[in-house]
């Protein structure tokens, strides 16, 4: 399943929701967290989680714009679950995350 945490407003909890959902899903199977926000807060969080050796830690990548859809589709084939954290503005990246979600 592919989830997208999106909203056109910043500060509403998208990243918090995305990272907690990704960890919960990682306990159930192989999970990818796509950070599609230029602030890269989800990727920063994931790096901290790996450094502190908390388990499970979802695989994380940063993608932007149309790459969220194009590369996201290819990457998703290797995972049971995918969570996309999109930036808080109406953008190509946000719309690509919505198109990728199931």
Each model region followed by its residue ranges:
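P-loop NTP-binding core
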Residues: 1-101
